[in-house]
Amino acid sequence: FNGKRILNPETVEIMTSNQVEKKAKPYKFDAFGFGVTVGVALNSKKMRMKRGDNSYFWGGAARTLFWVDPENDLVFVNMSQVLGSPRINNKVEKLVYKALGI
């Protein structure tokens, strides 16, 4: 912020890495985990996402969504306000990666 680092790189690494042990999650949720305040993609293919593994994300009730994909050097923020249309985020993600040739 204003040229000053607020968080150490090590802190960001902890916050954006899975903090939940595999045995603590039901089987169907083994493709993603949880960092500190974010979801973490552990197996993007299994999640049917274009994002790279270890990308992190979160979404809201009205289809707001952000994700950070370090593997592809990409940050996406969607601030739509549409209730009840969960599949639109998947379509938007595919379009973003297709447009970028990823």
What label would you give each PLM region?
Residues F1-I102:
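Catalytic loop of the DD-peptidase/beta-lactamase superfamily, centered on the K-T-G motif
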